[in-house]
Amino acid sequence: MLPAPHTLRIVADSTDRVAWLRARNQGITATDVAKLSTPKSILNAAHDKMHGTSFTGNSYTDHGRAREPVIAAWVLENYGIEPSTNLFRSLGHPRHLATPDGVGVAANGDLHLAEIKTTSKPWRSIPRSYMRQVWWQQYVLGADRTLLVWEEHRGFVPVAPVPECRWIERDEDQIAILVGLANALIDNLDEQTRR
């Protein structure tokens, strides 16, 4: 049996954190794209890519990292989407990168992703930055939909026995906007490295 096409575009695995971070730094990731919405945000993202950021995590990110495998196991059991630690590149642009939390192939052959979040606040709607992350991952991998899964906690204790989730469908219009913003960021980075 032939490997699934997206598996031919694996760039790195986050289990080798140094190689994964090095590979991520060479391109534009879903984390980068989540912050892109204005010309000023492109400049800020370029600065962070060129000079790094001082943020290395906090108790909330530590909690999210600790809970992610537990939530990923729930996603696998209930939706058949396998946990993933792979960094993928897009088919059309090698600097467009994404590391979804889960990747699965549906019975009809469609590629489905999972993105896992933890939150200390209830959501009235899905934060826009998370939608940008999801659409970017769909674009990079060629996925049709993503199961966005979030677990609310109070004092780092989950408030419900199971996480909440919602399917996010692919949106070509939003993806086109994100690709344009990412390419503007790449142009900015390339210009800075030529100086």
Segments predicted by a language model, with ranges:
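Short, well-ordered alpha-helical scaffold segments within catalytic/effector domains
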Residues: 68-72, 131-134
